[in-house]
C-alpha cells in the first residue's frame, strides 16, 4: 500500500481499517466518500453503501458479495489506474466489518498480501453465553470481550450472569441508576463490534406462566432493554424445579405425571412472547433453553415442548450431557427430532469452570463433528469465571463455527496464544509452556495431562533408570520457574491478571521439581545430608504452591478472598513429587508403621450422585468413591460407624480425585469422634485439604467418626470421598514427650517426611523418642531426619549404646551402628533444655549413607542419667514417662526400615 489511502464507508469498519493502515511505515491515511486519484485506495462497504464497489471487485477478479449468506464478505486486491487498490466488500455491515478483521491477518512485514478472498460462515449463531456461577465478569471485561468477539467473527453474546438479581430473583424489577447506565454501555459496546447483545431473562423460579401480569412484566423488561438498543431476547428455563408457583397454572395445566403439563405452560408463555412482542416489533426470533436441556433421546417433556412451541423460536441444548466430551452429527440429528425443532443450537459447557474453580481449561476445542452445521443454527460457549483466560477457547469456537469443515484445533489455539502474548517470541514461548500445564479437561476420555511436561518427566525417569542424563526436564522446569516474569509483559494483560495465581503456583511447583531433581542426584551419590536439604526445600515450594490464592463468590454474592488453591500441571507435578518423595523415603528407610483400617458402615447427610453411594467410602478401594449430588451446607457430614467402641490411632479421609489436588470435597471441615453418636469430640479442623489425616497422640475410644462441614463450600462444589479410613493404634514407637496440638509421635514413623512429630514444649531431662526396628533388619545406620538435639542410642539386650550425638540442629544425621550389634531398639535421648524437637522420621537402614558421624560408642547398662529406675514397657534404661506412650502389639515391618 502506498502513501495515501482513500477509504469509503462508515463507522467501526472505517475506524479499524484506518488503525490497520496507520501501523504501516510512512502511511498517510485520509477518509473520503469519493476516490482520490493521487493515492492508493482501500474501498470499504456493501453494494448499497459504496456505489461502484461491485464493479471494482469484478475488475480485480472477484465476485460480488451480494450472493453470499449473511455475514459473508469479499476481499479483492490489485492495481487500477496506476495505483494499488483493495476492496473490502460485505454482504452486509457485519460482513464488511469481518472483511476488515481478515485484512489484519493479511498485513505481514508492513505489506498487505495480494489476494482474493470470498468467505462466509456456516453457522449463523457464533459466540458465548455468560451463564456460569461464581464471580461475575467485570464491566470492563465484558466490553473487552465484545472487541475480542468482533475480531474473531463471533456475533452473539448472551447476557445471563447468575449474580444479576434483576435476571432471576428480581426479574420483574427494571434496571435503574448505575445498573441501567452500565447496561446501556454494554449494549453499545456489543453493537459497535457487530455482536448481538442477547438479553436472557430467567423467570422460572417464581413465574406464573398463565399470568397476564407476569407476561406484562416480561414485556416491560424487554421494552426497557430494547430502548437501549437490544434486539435479541431469550428466556432461560434451565436449573429450575419442574413445578408451578400459582393456582392458575395448576388449574389450566393439570399435572398428569408425564411432564407435558410444565412443557405446555412454558411453550404457551414463550409463544405469546414470540407472537405478541418479538414478531410485532420486527425482532429476531426468541431464544430459549428448556428445563430438560440435555440428551438426545425422546421423552414426553421434549416432545410436548417442541411440538407446541412456535417453530421460529431457537432452542438451546447442551449435548448428551451437561458436559459433552464429544458432539456427533447423529446425536444432534436425534436431538432435533426429539425436540421437534429445526432451530436447535448448542449451549456448549466448555471451558466453563464454575464446578472446578481451582482449574483453568486452556486445552483446545475438540471432538465437535465438522458436519454439525447441517443440523444446528450455531453454538455458544459457556466460558470460565476468568474472562480473559477464556479467550483461547472462545477463539476456537469462533474458528469452528465459522467453518467447521476446515477447523484445525491445534492451529487455532496456536494463533490465539500468539495474539494474546504479542509479538515477542520469548513471551509466546512462555505462554505455550503455561498453556501446556492446563490441558486436562475431566469430561474428556481419554484425557490429556500437561503433555509437554509429561514427556519431559517420562524422559527423565527413563534415562535415570539407565544411569544416563536427559536435560529436557531441567530446561522445562527452568522455563516454568520463569513464567511470572516471562508473561508479565504479554499483550493481553487481562489474561495475565486472570491467571496469575496459577502462574505463580506453576513457578513454585517447578522450583520444587528442581529441588527434587537435585535431591535424586544426591540420593544417587549416597549423600543423605544434601538429599534431605533438597527434599525440605522442595517441600517448602510445594507448600507455597498449595496455598489458597484464588478468590471466590458464593450464591450470597459475598466475595471471599484467597479461598481456593489453584490447581496447575494437570496432576503431573503432584505425581512427580509423589514419586520423588517415595524415592527419598526409601533412601532413608522410612516406611509407614501401619495397621489395617477397621470395617464400618458409612452414612451421609447428603444425597448421592448416580450409583456413587456412601458405602464406597469404606470398601477399601481408592478407585471408587462416594459422590454427593449437592454442595454441603454448614453442618452437613459424612460418617463411619465402627459397630462398637474401639481404640483409634489414626483417621484418614481421602477426598476429591487425588490426595494432592483440590476438587469436589469439604473445603471447611471438622473431624470429630463420638462414643454414642450424640456427644462429639473435636479432633481437628481442616481447610482446603484433599487429604484429611489425623494421628492421635494417644489412642482414643470411639464408635463413630465423622467429617462435618464448618461452612458452606466455595462455588457450591459437591463432595467426593474415595475412602474414609479409621485405623487402630500402632505400637512400634514410644515417647514421653507431649506433642504439640495437631501432632503425634506417630508422624515420626509414618513413612512421610512431609509430616513431623512436633513437641509442645522445650526438652526436659529424661525426654526420649524410641522405636523398635523391623524384624529381619540388620541395621548399619540409625537415621534422624528433623531438628533435635541429643544422643542417639541402640539397645541390645539390657545394654544401651550411644552411637552418636546431635548438637548442630541440622535436618539430617546418620550414625554407624557398631558391627555385630543386635539392635532391638533405637532411641533418641533428647538434650535437656534444648528447643522443642521436630522429628520428621527416625529409621534404620542396612546400608551406609553419608556423611556418617563416627563417635566412640559409650555403653549404658543402667538407666540413663536423669531418668527413673525401672523401665517403660519392660525395657531397661527408660525414664518414667510424663505422658502416656503409644503401645500395643508390634507388627513385623519391611526389612528396608521402620
PLM region spans:
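Short beta-strand-plus-loop segments that form exposed binding edges in beta-rich domains
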Residues: 708-715, 828-835
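Conserved Ser/Thr-centered positions that define the repeating blades of beta-propeller domains
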Residues: 674, 793-795
